[in-house]
């Protein structure tokens, strides 16, 4: 059998659905109706217009002889909301002596909506929020938009959930001062010295650059010679017959690697003289390069092809037709 508090909350819930207050949504999240989730939208023509706030309300079995405990899920930057506990500063909620048994769930939610949209600047619990709101309202609006989301209501129904246990979950309040400090550190962080140091201003890099440049000037001829040797080797390999190339690749189990200049010289000692001629003059180099390809490609199978072509030319077409 349900107690007195449960029956009173059922009555309050029915009354809330009947009145359908604009910008207020509430639903119980426990079977005994002691735990509630609430969403309140700021009133029109106020700095809170278009913003929504999530709260939790915890009733006890002593309701309505004692007020419930109200807390914001995300603590707003508001003069009348404690930045540490997330509890709103409303006299009949803070002081049980000022609580009246005539107060209902609807009266509590309406009082919260009025407090959010019309903050009291006398004796605020959040001094920083009161100071900014008094001196610069535009800055205050900007701060509010940092952590409040627009109101997005899927429907206006306020029915009991089919499975209340799915709605039950731990809620963690976040102080705005903690959130604001974390946001300030992230959004205004400065680059580390490593990324701020320009590359050309790094003495180590400049020294290494001149060292590389000096080595290149000293061994410029050697580098060009090695480049020409490798170029000739690759060109000669590409001109090999496909059958020979495939047979050679099938024997090798490891991927093909470009040989060093020493290996190329050992393979073909005459390449040294040819490559040297290529490097000395560009025009003579191309000629030597071409002659090198022709000399290297004079394989036996090419001679057979030439003999076959010569033999075909000697045939008498008239005799063949007969």
UniProtKB/Swiss-Prot annotation:
PROSITE patterns: UBC_1, UBC_2. The keyword Endoplasmic reticulum does not apply. It is an enzyme of class 2 (transferase). GO terms for biological process: protein ubiquitination. It catalyses: S-ubiquitinyl-[E1 ubiquitin-activating enzyme]-L-cysteine + [E2 ubiquitin-conjugating enzyme]-L-cysteine = [E1 ubiquitin-activating enzyme]-L-cysteine + S-ubiquitinyl-[E2 ubiquitin-conjugating enzyme]-L-cysteine. The active site is at 89 (glycyl thioester intermediate). Its EC number is 2.3.2.23. Autoubiquitinated in vitro in the presence of UBR5. Pfam families: UQ_con (PF00179). Disulfide bonds: none annotated. Residues 4-153 form the UBC core domain. Keywords: ATP-binding, Nucleotide-binding, Transferase, Ubl conjugation, Ubl conjugation pathway. InterPro entries: Ub_conjugating_enzyme, UBQ-conjugat_E2_core, UBQ-conjugating_AS, UBQ-conjugating_enzyme/RWD. Pathway: Protein modification; protein ubiquitination. It comes from the Eukaryota. GO terms for molecular function: ATP binding; ubiquitin conjugating enzyme activity. The keyword Lyase does not apply. Belongs to the ubiquitin-conjugating enzyme family. Catalyzes the covalent attachment of ubiquitin to other proteins. This is Ubiquitin-conjugating enzyme E2 U. It comes from Macaca fascicularis (Crab-eating macaque). The lineage of its organism: Eukaryota, Metazoa, Chordata, Craniata, Vertebrata.
């Amino acid at each position: 059998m349900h107690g007195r508090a449960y029956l009173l909350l059922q009555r309050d819930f029915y009354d809330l659905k009947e009145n359908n207050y604009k910008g207020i949504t509430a639903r119980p999240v426990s079977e005994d109706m002691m735990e509630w989730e609430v969403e309140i939208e700021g009133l029109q023509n106020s700095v809170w217009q278009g913003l929504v706030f999530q709260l939790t309300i915890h009733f006890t079995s002593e309701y309505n002889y004692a007020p419930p405990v109200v807390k914001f899920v995300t603590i707003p930057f508001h003069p009348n909301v404690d930045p540490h506990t997330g509890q709103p500063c409303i006299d009949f909620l803070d002081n049980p002596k000022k609580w009246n048994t005539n107060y209902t769930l609807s009266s509590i939610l309406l009082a919260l909506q009025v407090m959010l949209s019309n903050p009291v600047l006398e004796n605020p619990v959040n001094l920083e929020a009161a100071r900014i709101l008094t001196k610069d309202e535009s800055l205050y609006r900007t701060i509010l938009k940092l952590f409040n989301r627009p109101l997005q209501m899927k429907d206006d129904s306020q029915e009991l959930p089919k499975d209340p246990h799915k709605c039950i979950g731990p809620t963690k309040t976040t102080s705005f001062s903690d959130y604001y400090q974390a946001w300030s550190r992230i959004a205004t962080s400065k680059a580390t010295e490593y990324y701020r140091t320009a590359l050309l201003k790094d003495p180590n890099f400049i020294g290494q650059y001149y060292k590389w440049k000096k080595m290149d000037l000293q061994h410029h001829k050697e580098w060009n010679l090695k480049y020409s040797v490798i170029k000739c080797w690759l060109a000669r390999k590409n001109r090999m017959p496909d059958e020979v190339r495939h047979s050679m690749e099938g024997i090798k189990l490891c991927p093909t690697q470009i040989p060093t200049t020493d290996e190329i010289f050992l393979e073909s000692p005459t390449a040294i003289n040819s490559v040297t001629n290529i490097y000395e003059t560009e025009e003579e180099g191309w000629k030597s390069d071409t002659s090198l390809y022709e000399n290297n490609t004079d394989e036996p199978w090419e001679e057979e092809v030439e003999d076959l072509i010569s033999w075909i030319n000697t045939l008498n077409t008239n005799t063949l037709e007969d």
